Amino acid sequence: MKNFEIVSKFSPSKDQQNAIENITASIKNGNKYQTLLGVTGSGKTFTMANIIKNLQMPALIMTHNKSLAAQLYSEFKGFFPKNHIEYFISYYDYYQPEAYIPRQDLFIEKDSSINDELERLRLSATASLLSFDDVVTIASVSANYGLGNPAEYQGMVLFLEINKKFSLKFLLRKLVDMGYSRNDTYFDRGDFRVNGDIIDIYPAYFNDEAIRLEFFGDELDDMYHFDVIENKKTQNLKKFILYPTSQFIVGENRLKEAIKGIENELGERLEFFNDNGKLVEAQRLKQRVDFDLEMLESTGMCKGIENYARYLTGQNAGETPYSLFDYYEIKGMDYLVIIDESHVSLPQFRGMYAGDRSRKETLVEYGFRLPSALDNRPLMFDEFINKRAKFLFVSATPNDYELELSKDHVYYQILRPTGLLDPEIVLKDSDNQVEILYDMAKEVIADNERVLVTVLTKKMAEELSKYYLELGLKVKYMHSDIDAIERNELIRGLRTGDFDMLIGINLLREGLDLPEVSLIAIMDADKEGFLRSRTSLIQTMGRAARNVNGKVVMFCKKITNSMKEAIEITQKRRKYQDEYNKTHNITPKSVSRNVEESLKLDDTEAIDRAMKAEKMPSSERAKIVKDLRKQMMEAADKLEFEKAAALRDEIKKMRKL
């Protein structure tokens, strides 16, 4: 096994080192569950990386949204540049699952847009897990959803080696069985092409490189990576393992068994519907399943193939579905599961199964799916939490559930290496909250700092924004109706000073890390509920813990239990950090963090390109497409998927001209 090796100019602080040593010892002693309770800004990610290094154990890091997953992926790539850091989230840019609403007799077809880059990264993750031991995968809730059988997937690989003999007919047939398509004109991921004694294969999990095989008769004479765009050799190969284009690809025998099983279940279900006078449901089911069977027999794939996962994986009804966890467990090694922001992530994981089950039961009842589709599901919470792994829950505000599971193995990281204190908390009467906040905001803005305001409703966010605009403040609002790209632009705009105040409903959901913000205003802080719970209040206050002048103002008429507990915890941490700073002569300083690039293409640049493209010769257009493709690959490498998608769309437009 290749060792996990951290590359960093920093070394752990005393508080981090204590947490690292205690958690490492706890896991080595065989404890299944442990919790790291670390305040915002204390360097929990660096602590997590050091625990992995100490344990020398493959790890799966799970979090509750894609933005945080991307941030963690970037950080871990930096910490472990010599190891295999992978990214596994949903590959859908957009996803509308199929559903049926009986009272309206309305069937909603599945509608989705697959992001090719995210699909590549998912395939890269499973390929790495089967090929290497030094793997850390950053994942979202997708890790709990069903995948193909890892043993079947591994059994479909193609082993290539220099000087070995291969029948060309066998090789081409094997590539097709693995899901690769022959395309001698337009070469893309998941394709292969043949030119005499040369076969080029573009692995579905590679970015901008492919594999070239050069034969002398039946003997593999040469093999190397080459750059797809430049068509230049980049690395010689002696051996290479090629993985299929999908985790659901299965061998010929398994496919035949699956088709037979589907046919048998269809017969049983049609008999049930006919016996119960449900002729419409019977006709509907027969038509849909017969079409899927035709596709499976002719191509080995069909739309919605995941609904037949039980047969394709060879499992029994009700059996725990295969998931990303099984790709860790297939080698029999110990591994670590880290649940980041566990106070949000675990409740999200808990609710997945019930919602999925309810929708599919309706589809089965009305003849849109076979009952076996119910086995294409996310893991039940008990199946997830009882996996063979060791678990580490990480949060500034863990729930009672994590603490009860961890028992005596809860470890604290309260001190910040920067010396930053938890923010000062001020209580103000909510009767005049709008006017008081205006006066406080003007002072903060005069010092070139920013303001975050959290309210309870979309309407209030919009109206408060409008009111402050009329008073001359540069202010914007953010809520769930605003898409991901625009949210990113708003956060960027706040940080760069395009405007000074951002108003939102549940700003902590966005995983905001804004060192420029020195004032957090919590409107109607005494209105009990999810948005004003102890956990939410502490998380919201933490947004001001990146700035040396951080302050929180809570507008209220009374002090609720949630407020009281949040204030006491924050003040206790503030006092502890202050005493540590004085003892060690530390001067607090604000966090410094680069502003992320915009996800948008410059509109004027895009329009200019399009206008020129109509008038330019095809050779010039080809050069621009090549340049755009390179930019697209670079954007995808940086996980800037919206930007990559915009570039992809522009490439399509250029090719049509």
Curated annotation (Swiss-Prot):
Molecular function terms from GO: ATP binding; ATP hydrolysis activity; DNA binding; excinuclease ABC activity; helicase activity
InterPro entries the record matches: Helicase/UvrB_N (IPR006935), Helicase_ATP-bd (IPR014001), Helicase_C-like (IPR001650), P-loop_NTPase (IPR027417), UVR_dom (IPR001943), UVR_dom_sf (IPR036876), UvrB (IPR004807), UvrB_inter (IPR041471)
Motif DEAD box, residue range(s) on this chain: 130-133
Intracellular or extracellular location(s): Cytoplasm
Alphabetized Gene3D superfamilies for the sequence: 6.10.140.240, P-loop containing nucleotide triphosphate hydrolases, UVR domain
Motif Beta-hairpin: positions: 91-114
Keywords: ATP-binding, Cytoplasm, DNA damage, DNA excision, DNA repair, Excision nuclease, Helicase, Hydrolase, Nucleotide-binding, SOS response
GO cellular component: cytoplasm; excinuclease repair complex
Chief location of this protein within or outside the cell: cytoplasm
Residues in Helicase ATP-binding domain copies: 25-163
Coiled coil: none
GO biological process, one term: nucleotide-excision repair
Occurrences of domain UVR (ranges): 622-657
Domain Helicase C-terminal residue range list: 433-599
Keyword Translocase: no
Entry binding sites for ATP: G38, V39, T40, G41, S42, G43, K44, T45
Subunit: Forms a heterotetramer with UvrA during the search for lesions. Interacts with UvrC in an incision complex.
Family the UniProt entry places it in: Belongs to the UvrB family.
Domain notes: The beta-hairpin motif is involved in DNA binding.
Matches recorded under NCBIfam families: PRK05298.1 (NF003673), uvrb (TIGR00631)
Biological role stated in the UniProt entry: The UvrABC repair system catalyzes the recognition and processing of DNA lesions. A damage recognition complex composed of 2 UvrA and 2 UvrB subunits scans DNA for abnormalities. Upon binding of the UvrA(2)B(2) complex to a putative damaged site, the DNA wraps around one UvrB monomer. DNA wrap is dependent on ATP binding by UvrB and probably causes local melting of the DNA helix, facilitating insertion of UvrB beta-hairpin between the DNA strands. Then UvrB probes one DNA strand for the presence of a lesion.
The name this protein goes by in its record: UvrABC system protein B
Gene symbol of the encoding locus: uvrB
